[in-house]
Amino acid sequence: MTKQHAFTREDLLRCSRGELFGPGNAQLPAPNMLMVDRITHISEEGGKYGKGELVAELDINPDLWFFACHFEGDPVMPGCLGLDAMWQLVGFFLGWQGLPGRGRALGSGEVKFFGQVLPEAKKVTYNIHIKRVLKGKLNMAIADGSVSVDGREIYTAEGLRVGVFTSTDNF
């Protein structure tokens, strides 16, 4: 069977309901916290490190929930949502690889913000470069990522870490 290498909004919503990778396995958050509209490319090869890559997009419009509250009179997408989107995508990669368990963000190295997403923007693009996938007692991916708005890079994150756990009782 050939793996799917692109995912629509409906595919991602199925993932948020636990229908894409099976019950108890990697899920994306439901809207409003789902920060991705589509994955345009996912591969277990390629990227900066030759270990895999993802490219995903979020359509921006002035009616998105966060613009109304962050900040009143100065609307901007919270940077932490872009960071969370990158964690979401690293977790998705683990589920797509067939690794069992529920995803949890485990941290990151250096994160830099040097731009912003405003209501007049059209599209955010996420680029994830898988550095390493650990398989065993702990299934985890480590990746670097970036966020661009309308083609201009505005955030970077190094060492994004996400694990999948078959039990989160002692997490």
Swiss-Prot record:
<dbReference type="InterPro" id="IPR010083">
    <property type="entry name" value="FabA"/>
</dbReference>
<dbReference type="GO" id="GO:0034017">
    <property type="term" value="F:trans-2-decenoyl-acyl-carrier-protein isomerase activity"/>
</dbReference>
<dbReference type="GO" id="GO:0006636">
    <property type="term" value="P:unsaturated fatty acid biosynthetic process"/>
</dbReference>
<dbReference type="GO" id="GO:0005737">
    <property type="term" value="C:cytoplasm"/>
</dbReference>
<keyword id="KW-0443">Lipid metabolism</keyword>
<comment type="pathway">
    <text>Lipid metabolism; fatty acid biosynthesis.</text>
</comment>
<keyword id="KW-0456">Lyase</keyword>
<keyword id="KW-0444">Lipid biosynthesis</keyword>
<keyword id="KW-0413">Isomerase</keyword>
<dbReference type="InterPro" id="IPR013114">
    <property type="entry name" value="FabA_FabZ"/>
</dbReference>
<comment type="function">
    <text>Necessary for the introduction of cis unsaturation into fatty acids. Catalyzes the dehydration of (3R)-3-hydroxydecanoyl-ACP to E-(2)-decenoyl-ACP and then its isomerization to Z-(3)-decenoyl-ACP. Can catalyze the dehydratase reaction for beta-hydroxyacyl-ACPs with saturated chain lengths up to 16:0, being most active on intermediate chain length.</text>
</comment>
<comment type="similarity">
    <text>Belongs to the thioester dehydratase family. FabA subfamily.</text>
</comment>
<dbReference type="InterPro" id="IPR029069">
    <property type="entry name" value="HotDog_dom_sf"/>
</dbReference>
<dbReference type="GO" id="GO:0019171">
    <property type="term" value="F:(3R)-hydroxyacyl-[acyl-carrier-protein] dehydratase activity"/>
</dbReference>
<feature type="active site">
    <location>
        <position position="70"/>
    </location>
</feature>
<comment type="subunit">
    <text>Homodimer.</text>
</comment>
<protein>
    <recommendedName>
        <fullName>3-hydroxydecanoyl-[acyl-carrier-protein] dehydratase</fullName>
        <ecNumber>4.2.1.59</ecNumber>
        <ecNumber>5.3.3.14</ecNumber>
    </recommendedName>
</protein>
<keyword id="KW-0276">Fatty acid metabolism</keyword>
<dbReference type="Pfam" id="PF07977">
    <property type="entry name" value="FabA"/>
</dbReference>
<keyword id="KW-0963">Cytoplasm</keyword>
<keyword id="KW-0275">Fatty acid biosynthesis</keyword>
